[in-house]
Amino acid sequence: MPKRSDINHVLVIGSGPIVIGQACEFDYSGTQACRVLKEEGLRVTLINSNPATIMTDPEMADHTYVEPIEPEYIDKIFAKEIEQGHPIDAVLATLGGQTALNAAIQLDRLGILEKYGVELIGADIDAIERGEDRQKFKDIVTTIGGESARSRVCHNMEEVHETVAELGLPVVVRPSFTMGGLGSGLAYNTEDLERIAGGGLAASPEANVLIEESILGWKEFELELMRDTADNVVVICSIENVDALGVHTGDSVTVAPALTLTDREFQKMRDQGIAIIREVGVDTGGCNIQFAINPVDGRIITIEMNPRVSRSSALASKATGFPIAKMAAKLAIGYTLDEITNDITGETPAAFEPTIDYVVVKAPRFAFEKFVGADDTLTTTMKSVGEVMSLGRNYIAALNKALRSLETKQQGFWTKPDEFFAGERATDKAAVLEDLKRPTEGRLYDVELAMRLGASVEELYEASSIDPWFLAELEALVQFRQKLVDAPFLNEDLLREAKFMGLSDLQIAALRPEFAGEDGVRTLRLSLGIRPVFKTVDTCAAEFEAKTPYHYSAYELDPAAESEVAPQTEREKVLILGSGPNRIGQGIEFDYSCVHAALELSRVGYETVMVNCNPETVSTDYDTADRLYFEPLTFEDVMEVYHAEAQSGTVAGVIVQLGGQTPLGLADRLKKAGVPVIGTSPEAIDMAEDRGEFGALLNREQLPAPAFGTATSFEEARTVADEISYPVLVRPSYVLGGRGMEIVYDEASLEDYINRATELSSDHPVLVDRFLDNAIEIDVDALCDGDEVYLAGVMEHIEEAGIHSGDSACALPPMTLGAQDIEKVREATKKLALGIGVQGLMNVQYALKDDILYVIEANPRASRTVPFVSKATGVNLAKAASRIAVGATIKDLQDEGMIPTEYDGGSLPLDAPIAVKEAVLPFNRFRRPDGKTLDTLLSPEMKSTGEVMGLANNFGAAYAKAEAGAFGALPTEGTVFVTVANRDKRTLILPIQRLALMGYKILATEGTAGMLRRNGIECEVVLKASDIREGVEGKSIVDRIREGEVDLILNTPAGSAGARHDGYDIRAAAVTVGVPLITTVQGVTAAVQGIEALREGVVSVRALQELDHAVKA
């Protein structure tokens, strides 16, 4: 049936900030949807609070609202669009993850959809509830003749205990309507049950959890399906988890297609999947269904479904080349599958199920090093922060490629000594087998080590529950390793076999010391003519010719195998190196810059080539660049892509400055290997990173910087610290996201840091800087063409210096800097950019203290603030930087209208909106091994996974929006609990007085209460948790927070051990029940301004396209 004629205007709901369980795969799906709907002639309005997304670019929709994804803001958007003569007909909520689905349910329940006569498309409320509500879904599985695990939905702890009495322990706890397994877990005893089920009830928007019999150790599978209004159903992809049930699918290594199913099992699962999608009622889009199979008797159980595009959908799309989100958007507006053409072949309809003739492996990326003390056991709550995908001709080759794509310290098997990851267990088979019973991020390395120590497949299956087929594949690799080690010399056949199994030159060199590193292996390999061939992802196993060049590398045993890379055009090519897996410190913001570079350079006549391995991103969509290579971002893999491209045409250069630290780290070696690195040169990159050279530049230009020194031992570090005086900031050189960075207040802490963190310094010394207490931190993005500098954005941090810039809220334009301060910033930035030799983007961090502007650091690359600054000022910095890299000047770009001439980021027009960026932190995902929450205090070590933006005409309203978008909506009435360190008491009198005058009830601990009362502020004294521990009778503040009696917490950390412990208890309780928590003085002041704006009702919505200075597409 053709497109519906009654839908002319669609509101697409995005997924908001990047959080664990919901990452940039929804930017990818939402971007596809917006493009499709606009191509179909519909008017598109978008709401998404995340500025770091491609979908929030003004050209992606007719009206883009960067607003919190909350019913009250969506209500304002409906009203505003009617006011402007563009009433919204339908809402598409199936492409924005769980956030969008939950928003759609709230809009329905609050009567907002009915009020404006708007319908839901993609999946209606009934289908969403039938798929998401645990009991309803369980009933559907029974109706179609399927089987679920024995379970019961519980609404309170009493029902939970009754159910467990029936099922017995252990049990699985699964809350309804959450994503990434938030609030779920495995309860082995009553204590676990109380903690996990209590947290699950709090995490579920419906306040219910499913308590389910344990089916740990079963095999887990997923099917990705689509259905249209004519009842056509296609199964796009099957996915198998290498880890057994009990590890969240987002934390497991997964493979596509499923490799260990019998044909009978697959057909049975497929039949059940089709029956479920029909019974649930998803008839205009896609869904994902998870199954478990008992390895002993083949019994199949249906676990759950997502009646929407999910994280697995993005993986299935990239794995098969079948654009699920694009198809889902077309189905939502009335098309049927047989009416839609497959883009990749250009001739088959979407009703043809994809066929793949390769193996895909997805591997998760973790960040436990950022959360000291966190329990690293993998359970049903997702903890990974990113993922990679690799494609190979066989499982082991794809697995090896995936492991080196992760960019962890261990770059694949054998690249580090066994002691590096196994410690004392490196020679103890029994200890390794024992450890394998507890799933952790390094378990595949443990499996491989245990095999070398003599463990059999049976023993390993018993310990890990990993299917024997996967274990046998690893066993074959271990046997080949021995062959490689034992060979008297490395001949052509052996080297070909090693490469066929996916081993990198680095892995081979680790086993053959005569090569003295990977360069030796590379020289031999090239002399023997052993290079990869590049295969094409075509959705049809080469049955039809692919029209879109989407490639992966493979080494064949046959020397005559041919590559499938053909010249597309006569245009010069530019390779853009992506940012690899999301991790804390390097996420979607860098992908944003890579995507814009690809689109802009393609527009001005270059053939763009994207190299990346992250399946969640827009950059790895097959139609972002002219050609896509799904490859690891290592020197070896990038060089092979460069060689393949150079064989088929002229390569103008490689851009390394947009993808974060990953490609930047390759710049030097690429240049030495003869690859033209365009944009900022590798020498300039090194100069900015080298403390000696950079310090010399600062001296020449007379730019102040905090006193610093470098040290390679504790003794040296102590000498430096004594000279420049405490507190000092210590860190390894060459880091991103503040990894390994700490503020140290005394010698004992310094010694502790050196003992713990020197391992991070990777042959670079530890840096010791004077820490500027109570300074204002300033973040600057700028463009430089070698002669001229454009100041793109000046951001003032709301938190004081000492909190990582990625975790601090910031405002643009700056709120407290005067014209003189900004002029100092402009002059210093110009001197730095020209002195370093920047060609493109540069980010500088400054600290302003006592009217002196100190340079903290300069990074000659795209920063994580580029998308935020671009949205706030209307100047697309990534596009501009890509043009400068290929020779354009700032004057050229001003003449084109890409960069304004009448103002810059330091002198924005008076009517420019105020933009506030706020970080989103994942503390609700991590616990200590004893089950307690991690402390939520911010530090120089970055911990946030994502960000949101608040836009308004005044700071208070912008800050309030940013907090609401970051899941910390400020209360407009109620009870505020205040407990602050002595040093902060004087500063906080005024903001707390304003709260009291607005009618808030103030609770305070004894010391803080005395100070407040002396200043005429009425408050109630509360007991601390330590008072109760010491025998004082009554209810502690921690209990009151847990029982919902507190609406906002203001807690600045104190120095003494007892006070720190009380502070931790308070912050942990706040995280558990989701009460907004502010831990800095500046944050309190900003929050009071935000609350005032909310109470005065001055918070309105405004589309990016309406801003006078927005760059029009």
Curated annotation (Swiss-Prot):
Cofactor stoichiometry and binding remark: Binds 4 Mg(2+) or Mn(2+) ions per subunit.
Chain spans, region Carboxyphosphate synthetic domain: 1-407
Catalytic activity: hydrogencarbonate + L-glutamine + 2 ATP + H2O = carbamoyl phosphate + L-glutamate + 2 ADP + phosphate + 2 H(+)
Pathway the protein acts in: Amino-acid biosynthesis; L-arginine biosynthesis; carbamoyl phosphate from bicarbonate: step 1/1; Pyrimidine metabolism; UMP biosynthesis via de novo pathway; (S)-dihydroorotate from bicarbonate: step 1/3
The organism's place on the tree of life at top rank: Bacteria
Record: residues binding ATP 1: 134, 174, 180-181, 213, 215, 220, 246-248, 290, 304
The protein's assembly and partners: Composed of two chains; the small (or glutamine) chain promotes the hydrolysis of glutamine to ammonia, which is used by the large (or ammonia) chain to synthesize carbamoyl phosphate. Tetramer of heterodimers (alpha,beta)4.
Protein name (record): Carbamoyl phosphate synthase large chain
